[in-house]
């Protein structure tokens, strides 16, 4: 496994610097094709939706199943930083912003343009991910809602 700080030749302390989500998107399309790009956009959108401000370079990785061709590793470190860091921003820049609440369809259109990505893949993946996350959350929130502190220890 090779995390993206290693891919870009950066020391771990630079995991929040030097590279943007736009750079990563272009690299993934180049190395992993449309399938890899679709998965990357899916994860990026999901992390924005759940408020994960910690998707830095060491939380994205490649695996090399044939020892030479990279594929995105399974997702890991998916969490919401929002409850712990109100107002938290993205770990890396997405087009010209780190503010999650500014990550609109227009930002993803700009991502497609800047990174030379197929816009239809970016936008359709974004739409599908938003809908799936909302649909699943309405079902799952009943199961995973935090208990009140009064009955948590009982």
Q: Where do the language-model regions lie?
A:
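Anionic ligand-binding catalytic core segments
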Residues: 1-57, 61-154
